[in-house]
Amino acid sequence: MEKNERFKMHKVKKRWVTISVASATMLASALGASVASADTETVSEDSNQAVLTADQTTTNQDTEQTSVAATATSEQSASTDAATDQASATDQASAAEQTQGTTASTDTAAQTTTNANEAKWVPTENENQVFTDEMLAEAKNVATAESNSIPSDLAKMSNVKQVDGKYYYYDQDGNVKKNFAVSVGEKIYYFDETGAYKDTSKVEADKSGSDISKEETTFAANNRAYSTSAENFEAIDNYLTADSWYRPKSILKDGKTWTESSKDDFRPLLMAWWPDTETKRNYVNYMNKVVGIDKTYTAETSQADLTAAAELVQARIEQKITTEQNTKWLREAISAFVKTQPQWNGESEKPYDDHLQNGALKFDNQSDLTPDTQSNYRLLNRTPTNQTGSLDSRFTYNANDPLGGYELLLANDVDNSNPIVQAEQLNWLHYLLNFGTIYAKDADANFDSIRVDAVDNVDADLLQISSDYLKAAYGIDKNNKNANNHVSIVEAWSDNDTPYLHDDGDNLMNMDNKFRLSMLWSLAKPLDKRSGLNPLIHNSLVDREVDDREVETVPSYSFARAHDSEVQDLIRDIIKAEINPNAFGYSFTQDEIDQAFKIYNEDLKKTDKKYTHYNVPLSYTLLLTNKGSIPRVYYGDMFTDDGQYMANKTVNYDAIESLLKARMKYVAGGQAMQNYQIGNGEILTSVRYGKGALKQSDKGDATTRTSGVGVVMGNQPNFSLDGKVVALNMGAAHANQEYRALMVSTKDGVATYATDADASKAGLVKRTDENGYLYFLNDDLKGVANPQVSGFLQVWVPVGAADDQDIRVAASDTASTDGKSLHQDAAMDSRVMFEGFSNFQSFATKEEEYTNVVIANNVDKFVSWGITDFEMAPQYVSSTDGQFLDSVIQNGYAFTDRYDLGMSKANKYGTADQLVKAIKALHAKGLKVMADWVPDQMYTFPKQEVVTVTRTDKFGKPIAGSQINHSLYVTDTKSSGDDYQAKYGGAFLDELKEKYPELFTKKQISTGQAIDPSVKIKQWSAKYFNGSNILGRGADYVLSDQASNKYLNVSDDKLFLPKTLLGQVVESGIRFDGTGYVYNSSTTGEKVTDSFITEAGNLYYFGQDGYMVTGAQNIKGSNYYFLANGAALRNTVYTDAQGQNHYYGNDGKRYENGYQQFGNDSWRYFKNGVMALGLTTVDGHVQYFDKDGVQAKDKIIVTRDGKVRYFDQHNGNAVTNTFVADKTGHWYYLGKDGVAVTGAQTVGKQHLYFEANGQQVKGDFVTAKDGKLYFYDVDSGDMWTNTFIEDKAGNWFYLGKDGAAVTGAQTIKGQKLYFKANGQQVKGDIVKDADGKIRYYDAQTGEQVFNKSVSVNGKTYYFGSDGTAQTQANPKGQTFKDGSGVLRFYNLEGQYVSGSGWYETAEHEWVYVKSGKVLTGAQTIGNQRVYFKDNGHQVKGQLVTGNDGKLRYYDANSGDQAFNKSVTVNGKTYYFGSDGTAQTQANPKGQTFKDGSGVLRFYNLEGQYVSGSGWYKNAQGQWLYVKDGKVLTGLQTVGNQKVYFDKNGIQAKGKAVRTSDGKVRYFDENSGSMITNQWKFVYGQYYYFGSDGAAVYRGWN
């Protein structure tokens, strides 16, 4: 390199020397001083300025030895005086060229040297150099700055905007694009992680000269390691890390004097060596603040300047050590600095969101670098679905859970495929189940059973191992009694797990997760997200529509919530939404948790909940009354999840307690469930028939009659029966029996009734009918909304059960012969589990608050609830590493010593002694106690190891682009060796092998090998783990040489150290050598070739010739792109000149083909290096990728072609032939091509309509393309047909059989109507036909008017017999109706008649006008009884049937009504009596007739008139009753009977009749008596007839 230096004379100890001005200004820069210009400054003869030697030429060879504390170098310049440059090199240059050693000082005698090729050397005698205060004097600060220039064409780009002096690229939606490069012409513009344009045209190369200063040599000589012996280094497994310290040869005591180090004088490695220039600069800047130097260095600072600055920092460090008399502060400072560097923190471990703890690491099975951590096993994902390494053909493949689980769940993941580990798991299982015997020498304190945690995340071999132990130790396969005494359960979420366990013998019991999901979505979700109720019957391991089985197919336990299900998820959501939006996963602080629970607990008390579950009492009603599964009650549903143990009851406590107590007393027998639409919603019913009655028809015994339960519930708060009736068939055993309410929802919550008397007092007692039906009427079932219920709930039980009735069944000791251990029979159904803890309960503040103490004091309460199996919290002393929620809240699932059950100290739940007392107390009352077996993971161990790891997802699949790829990583995987693991690990294997030898010979499925007891694991280490979580230590925490990828190691056989630690001066960094840019290794100082180098956060590649490459490159089969400054594109989308997008990962490699994951469930797809955008067909499936290339999942997308599609939430495929709803509640139907249909569509049997945007029309009118109007149902969306409908404006329409609104004249159900062209019905208006005829349609009914006059808008029309109008202008001899509907008359002269009198009409008929009104109907005028038609015309010579139904006759001449005479009309003779009404004239036998007064009379079968009283049969054999000569009609009381006679006097029998009061009554088919207070099935419907005999129509069927 060329150098341009200016020299100046300085007086040093009375001798003049020449010093490079560049060197002086450099050190001045380091010191932050300000002095005059170097080439004009005058130095006095007496100046005592310190000599700051660097690449200098001295004019006096006898210059005294000078000690310095900083290095001075010169700035590179384009023009140079070659002679000066050469002169400045002097002996420093020659020293740099030496191959045998490095000179410690340029003006002293040669010291002992070290051959650079030798691996070891020994320390030499110390040279006690003295640094004076003068040597640290202030100097001049010279700084230069280079401004970035913005290309003119960049500023012209329409997408680029300038903001605050920086340029940003905006996408089509106005969002700033980050980590983005775009090709424009022949140029590439790069926008960094902030989105700002970054000039990448210049290489950031060091401008320093290659000469080495005396000070550099001095520091190198003294900072070298005391020796290469490992004892002089703080290493992990002999590997050096960023936190490593070492013993240097000398320390700069008090920052002044080099003094030989003692064995205790360790210093941070980073004080003397750095892996790259960027880290070195960051170190200097960071430590400057620590030691009080006010100076900041930038990327423009030269290596020489940084070296000088680092030396000054070292001097200040030593000064502070002298002052503080310790290095504690320095260790804290260095550790803190390390965490700021991306290669040593989580930045280089990204992505963060593919694992519960941000990310996973898989340990390499084979690695020469870490042979002690190797394994022959680590068979990942060997779940029940994939136990052999291939998918089990017995089970259903689920694309969303392909392996039925995954391996890397949390923390240090135990390798449960390792036979040695499998033996240790058996050892630990035995210890747990025999804890009382082993720890307290008291078998009564042993656990009875286990819960197996996280089954889908461990090797399924453990299920065989634990099952075989339970069979061997307890004989659970021998009989039900043994099995029920040791019911062990598993936490296994895959649908394949239960059939797997069943095929294996049902030795362990799994959860009914399907039923949990049914409760969640049918009941617990907010109203707008709830499903129907039908899944509660069918979506379960047990179909309960009719369950009359003695034994279910598979055993199971059921729950609504658990310690880690629907609790911590809700707390996470609250924290994310309301406390810390940057929170990720389950990494919370205790303070955040405390804040979240304040919101959570208040939300639980609200009617309209935002986070917590709705309808908890409804869920528990089903859990605790269902047949065929053991219910598990969760502690947090009865007591608050937070707070002291059992201190605070929830709002649902009373309801759950009531159900628990009722379960023991009533819940037994077969079960039937129904779900149907009724009223304005749907209901769910459930009936248990009682002990001894499996079927509805079973009569059972006395206990059957006093047991059983009926449930009615709904999930709609606005529910109403709307007059309908619900009938529960309680079973034949319960006919004609009283039932009473146990629990009823009210407007305020849930009311519970503990006794028959309580319910009776509340009026909540019902009686079944003779068929065992219990009926619920309109007022019984109403939806409510309160903090407990959003819907309705009623639970009913038989009256009369004894207070101490207990219907539970004991297990049989009869030998089991079906090859199964657990049987879900009545005895198993009698059990109730209690998950007796919450993750979030508070830490005890005093002894009596410890969980296990409280449990022991409350055993009687658990007994009163009917608890049979008490599931204890995991009793392990918790890790406190705070890496995951479990170790923050210390719930027992995060531990480092599995055998420490509160022996070393109290855990969250108490001490080991308190645990013993709790177990014994539970046992004393007959309860079984369950331990939590957690074989999946272990947390931060106290000792560290270096392990070869690869960054993977939770399945162990490598993460594309990760910097951690077969890399060394420091893990917390080694236990102390002096804990309870050391005491009990493997301790029981020999005993177990002797007692149960079959356990040690059975070959396990995943390995094909038996468990291996030969090695007793006394100390955990990495070789027993599959992997771990990322720990935030970064990709390069274990230090290495970038060029060679060799790790720094201090072992004898792998010794590799930076030459700096061997006393040599190393010049590193990117430099220009006159031909191109090269890189010198910070470790060896040598020029690198064929190597990737990370410098200043950028990735470079130096080719086979050692020169930096640019542009597109294919290196060892992978494609990269290097910008003009040599930096590779990383984590960047690059849009090329053709507009195609490419993605370069964290390792700089271009993603080539297939899917690549970005975040938890964010995917991109690539083909031949091109990133998919928009609609893309992948393997025959249409998928969509947004403008950033991210795959659409669970999204409705309007694609570029304007069509609407929905992409599946799991696989992202376009969904076909399916309905989907968006977040606003709009529905779409995706056709066979995946496109949302539009317009009129027939889907199944429904006729639907979809808008142009694909949204389904519901509850609205649609004008279709044919111009016709249609209406679609508000709920189903189905098209209405053959019905009237009113719009919001009050207009009526009629929708025809094709659904279209009819137009024009229509006859509908006998009515002549008219509809406008837009479908609106005409009412109260005239219509003119095309032929000019006018018609009028009534204002109320809309019916066409005939034979009447109507005034419309002041004009009078008369509408004749054909309904058409005749002009009425002063009509002569005509009647008409005025605007008020009053009939008026114009006389034959055309004059309006306003007075009174008789008038002849134009038809020569007569009308009578009274005060201007034309009379109609029966009238008395003078002495005449006359009758007028509706048009006012008098009736003459005609019969008239009056409104009373009676027949009258008016004389043909006078019009007088006929009285007491016979008249023949139309050939038929009538007799009109004294009242003027007609009577039949003969004396018929067995017939009724009306006399002249209208009184109904009767002639008996002999033809004799009946004048007395009594029952008589008529000619048709029907009965009637005559009282004092009159035939009775209507509702009558005869004797003690309430009977009914029709208008002809005929008695009603076996029929329902609507009586004169409008009510329907039913009369017995035999006696004819009116029935009361009972149900009757009539005409296909049920009616309930009350105490007055009146029916309440309910329509239940």
UniProtKB/Swiss-Prot annotation:
Cell wall-binding repeat boundaries on the chain: 157-176, 178-197, 1089-1108, 1109-1128, 1130-1150, 1152-1172, 1173-1191, 1193-1214, 1216-1236, 1237-1256, 1258-1279, 1281-1301, 1302-1321, 1323-1343, 1344-1365, 1366-1380, 1415-1434, 1436-1457, 1459-1478, 1485-1505, 1508-1527, 1528-1547, 1549-1570, 1572-1591
Signal peptide boundaries: 1-38
Enzyme Commission number, as recorded: 2.4.1.5
Compositional bias per record (Low complexity), positions renumbered to this chain: 53-114
Any GO BP annotation: glucan biosynthetic process
Keyword terms, alphabetized: Dental caries, Glycosyltransferase, Repeat, Secreted, Signal, Transferase
Region: Glucan-binding, residue numbers: 1099-1597
Renumbered residue ranges of the record's region Catalytic: 200-1050
Purpose: Production of extracellular glucans, that are thought to play a key role in the development of the dental plaque because of their ability to adhere to smooth surfaces and mediate the aggregation of bacterial cells and food debris.
Protein name: Glucosyltransferase-I
Species: Streptococcus downei
Gene name linked to the record: gtfI
